């Protein structure tokens, strides 16, 4: 799915991430993994920026790694089921003093 031209463009072959990475069609991979250390980014030669939990399993060292907190452990958050049936508030259990991924992304956007 692409929204590059302002409207949804669905083409399962054209926008297949595995194919795009293999063919080096992207400039960079931005990988967000704040829930589990097992959600590692794909191994690719494309430069990769990772916003992830400490201990995230990485297939290779990314160009940039920014540690972020886990919602419900390091900061408050909200867990939404994929089918949008249930939305659960998550409390900050104070495990670590790591920022929410949303704050990091907002800071990156503000710097651009």
Question: Which residues does each predicted region cover?
Answer:
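Non-catalytic alpha/beta scaffold blocks inside enzyme catalytic domains
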Residues: 2-112
